[in-house]
Amino acid sequence: MAFNFNWSPLMADAGFYTRAQELLTAALNKSPKPPIIVDDIVVTELNLGSNPPELEILEIGDLAEDRFRGIFKMSYAGDAFLTLKTCVQANPLNTYLLTRHPFTSPQPLAAATGLTIPLQITLSDIKLSGFVILVFSKQKGITVVFRNDPLESLKVSSTFDSIPFVRDYLQKEIEGQLRILFMDELPAIIHRLSLRLWGTEYSELETTSAQVTNPSLDGPGLDPLLNPPQDPVDASGNVLSISEIASLSLDSGVEMHSLFSRKNVLRLAALTDSQRTLSLFTPSIREVVFRAWTGSMEQADGPSGLVSPMSPPLSRTHSHIATSSLSLQDAASLASSSHSRPTPPSSGFSGYGLSMGAGRHSKAHARKRKKRVVDLRRRPKSADDMESVSGESAYTETSTTTSAVSVFSGSTIPEENNDDPVTPPVSPQRTIRRPTLRDRIAARDDAERNSRRGIPAEFGHDLPTVRTSPPIANDMARIITSASNLQRQLQQQQPADSKPLPSLQETAPIRTLRPSPSSTPQYPTEKPNASNNYTSSSSPSARDPQQQQPQQLSRPSSSFIMESAQNGGILEQAWMMKMASEIARRIQDEKMGGEDPTNSSSRGGSGGGFWERPSMRSHTPPPAYRH
């Protein structure tokens, strides 16, 4: 079974084509257009042609006087055509940048300038073939649904037919858009057209909606801003009187829309200020923490209690400005109480930092800071006062050798704190006597040698160091203990009428940086018979063969330097250590005078005969190469 369409009435009705063009234009502009199309698509010409489509009935589901439902096979190869007009973007770089995020685009200046070209497209030689479900009803109109894609071929003629690339691109894009049109938009267009033809109620409803959307049909509209508000203000916020409002008109040049209600203006201003400054006008929001709050009730929450005028505290997060917590009173109390836990010195250099708390009550749950203090003050009473206190442990550094004399009882060399404004210098505890002529001559020779070369590594080139390693401290204590025992044996072997040898402290002279006649240091006076026992190196008969064991000489222990550092600086310490080594060297030379100097040098270490015997000098690297 087939149908014969009467195609002539559709071609003769001019209103039908007008309504069809409007519906097609709305349908083409409804979906999002590609970025190359920069203007609306307008249908300028529409002609269905003289050849009607062919329908073949496959199934009839319902048949009555006012309704029909069936499935058809449709074929169309007529002379219908459609003409469209739009504007396209001819610059592909501009089109590319429009589809990309501005953050990732190179932002060219001249190359991205748009070039808009008008475009006219004509669609002809349309060939359709597909299965159609047709439902007809006088009350509901005609509904046409395509079960498959009906478009087989299409010819596209445009302004850019001379450019093959553009022609192929337009052909591909338009075919894709028409396939969407036939499957989605064309059934809705046909349904609306059928309602206009057979449904009078629909036509009246459509006319009413058109009048609402187009107010020009009912005459000129009313200006909603013509009537001023009850409390009008101008653009500057000044309240206007009734006479000033009456003098205003739409033709006087004064804009009537500047008259707003004063209450509304205040609300808008408060809303704007709240977004800028987070002020009190901000409406309260649940479960939201304010980032700033400058009220007086919150300023006392900081632990320091001090507020800088340039940076007020952020009390909502319990921020406060950290101040220097170490003052002169703290330092005085620190010096007075030596056994108490001192304040950490680092707190005085903390600066003005911003410490943030976790919440409003973060101080109660704050984590305790570790207090790590190193006390380097001199304790003349005992060596146990040199303590290093940490947050969890404390340890005491004592002498590594308990059998040594009391002069060498420490293993650390503290730096002399000359910049301490609180702790006074400790006065010397022993009487200083005038040096002998021999000591002054030796001091002058040593000064000349020190002017030619620096103090070697054996005599304290690392004096400023704070700590001495335990092996070096053990060697020094052992050397000084051996020297003391040797001196004690020599005193026992002397006759009863001879005077005893001076102690190691008395023979070590001390000199100041700037000697003056009034404050010249006094040294112990030595007699020839007492000094010959350890200064002369030419009488082999005075030596005991049982005491010819080599003594390794090194610099003295650090506590001896600490005790003698009360009277001077680094030069005094170097001098004292050199003299102690010289005394030990002379005692060794007295015992080892008959032996080979080279062998004695190898056994005696680096301290024997350094200044007088160059052949016995040990091959110790310079101070710069020992670290």
UniProtKB/Swiss-Prot annotation:
GO terms of biological process kind: mitochondrial genome maintenance; mitochondrion-endoplasmic reticulum membrane tethering; phospholipid transport
Domain SMP-LTD span(s) in chain numbering: 1-195
One GO MF term attached to the UniProt entry: lipid binding
Protein's name according to its UniProt entry: Mitochondrial distribution and morphology protein 34
Membrane topology recorded in Swiss-Prot or TrEMBL: Multi-pass membrane protein
Basic residues composition-biased segments: 360-372
CDD domains noted in UniProt: SMP_Mdm34 (cd21673)
Cellular location(s): Mitochondrion outer membrane
Disulfide links within the chain: none
Recorded family membership: Belongs to the MDM34 family.
Bias type Basic and acidic residues, positions: 373-384, 436-451
Domain of life: Eukaryota
Free-text note regarding domains: Lacks alpha-helical transmembrane segments, suggesting that it resides in the membrane via beta-sheet conformations similar to those predicted for other outer membrane proteins and porin.
Location of the region described as Disordered in the Swiss-Prot/TrEMBL record: 209-230, 332-470, 486-557, 586-627
Subunit structure, as described in the record: Component of the ER-mitochondria encounter structure (ERMES) or MDM complex, composed of MMM1, MDM10, MDM12 and MDM34.
Biased composition (Low complexity): 215-225, 332-341, 390-412, 528-557
Known role: Component of the ERMES/MDM complex, which serves as a molecular tether to connect the endoplasmic reticulum (ER) and mitochondria. Components of this complex are involved in the control of mitochondrial shape and protein biogenesis, and function in nonvesicular lipid trafficking between the ER and mitochondria. MDM34 is required for the interaction of the ER-resident membrane protein MMM1 and the outer mitochondrial membrane-resident beta-barrel protein MDM10.
GO annotations of cellular component type: ERMES complex
Species the sequence originates in: Blastomyces gilchristii (strain SLH14081)
